[in-house]
Regions:
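Conserved catalytic core of the tyrosine transesterase superfamily
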Residues: 1-231
Length: 231
C-alpha cells in the first residue's frame, strides 16, 4: 500500500507563499511583500475574532466566501478603507488561495468559491489639478530659513517636476540623481519598474542648493535619501 500523501496546513502554506512563491519564485518587490504581509496581518486578526480560534488553529477550509466577504465588509465599514484598497487586499488573498489550491487540492471546493467572488466596482473620478498660481503658492509656502522648509521646497519641486508618487519620492537616493547639462532622476516605481525623468534647470539647482547632491559635494553615500524625514 502506498503511503497517504499529507497536505500542508494553512500556517505552512502561508509561510511558503511568502518565502517561496513571492520572494523566491516571483521575485516580488519589498513593497509588494510588505503590502501582502499587512493584508494577512489584518485578515488573521479578523479571522481570530470571527472564528474564535488562534491563527495557528485556522484551517484552509475556514477561508470560505462567508469569512472573506465579512472581512472585506469589515475593511470598508469598520476601517473606512476605500474600494480600491479593499480590492487590493482581496487580490492578495486570492493570490495566496490560488497558490494554496495547487498545494492542497482537497480544499479546491472552498477555494473555488472565493476565487469566483468579483472585485467591487467603483467610479474612477477625474484627477483634480491645481492652477499655475496655486502651484506657485504651494512651492513658495515652505520657510526657506529652516532646515525643514528647505527640504520641503525640494520635495515639492521634485514632485511637481517628475509627477512621482510620494512613495517613489521617499525612495529616491543620491545615486538616482544626475546633475549635468542633461540633469535627470531615476524613479523606482511599482513592480520594480524604473523610469528616468529629465529635471528642469530650476529643480536641478534647488537639489544642488539643498546640499545632498552637488557637483563637488563631500563624500555622501549614494544610498542616502534625497529628502530624509529627519535631520
Amino acid at each position: 500500500m502506498s503511503a497517504k500523501l499529507t497536505e500542508p496546513n494553512f500556517a505552512t502554506l502561508l509561510q511558503r507563499f511568502f518565502t517561496e512563491r513571492l520572494i523566491h519564485q516571483k521575485n516580488a518587490s519589498p513593497r509588494t511583500v510588505s503590502s501582502y504581509r499587512d493584508t494577512f496581518r489584518l485578515f488573521l486578526q479578523f479571522a481570530q475574532q470571527r472564528l474564535r480560534k488562534p491563527p495557528t488553529k485556522i484551517e484552509l477550509t475556514d477561508i470560505d466566501t462567508t469569512l472573506v466577504s465579512a472581512f472585506l465588509d469589515h475593511l470598508e465599514v469598520d476601517r473606512h478603507n476605500t474600494i480600491r484598497s479593499r480590492n487590493a487586499r482581496f487580490a492578495a488573498l486570492r493570490s495566496f488561495l490560488q497558490y494554496a489550491g495547487l498545494m492542497a487540492p482537497t480544499a479546491l471546493g472552498t477555494i473555488r468559491g472565493v476565487m469566483a467572488m468579483p472585485m467591487k466596482r467603483f467610479e474612477r473620478r477625474l484627477v483634480g489639478y491645481l492652477s499655475r498660481e496655486e502651484i506657485k503658492a504651494l512651492l513658495n509656502a515652505p520657510d526657506l530659513a529652516t532646515w525643514f522648509g528647505q527640504r520641503d521646497r525640494v520635495m515639492l519641486a521634485t514632485l511637481y517636476n517628475t509627477g512621482a508618487r510620494v512613495s517613489e519620492l521617499i525612495s529616491m537616493t543620491v545615486g538616482d540623481v544626475v546633475l549635468d547639462r542633461s540633469s535627470s532622476i531615476r524613479i523606482h516605481g511599482k513592480g520594480r519598474k524604473e523610469r528616468s525623468v529629465p529635471l528642469w534647470r530650476t529643480t536641478a539647482n534647488q537639489i544642488r542648493l539643498w546640499g545632498y547632491v552637488r557637483i563637488k559635494a563631500p563624500a555622501i553615500a549614494r544610498s542616502s535619501q534625497i529628502v530624509p524625514a529627519v535631520r
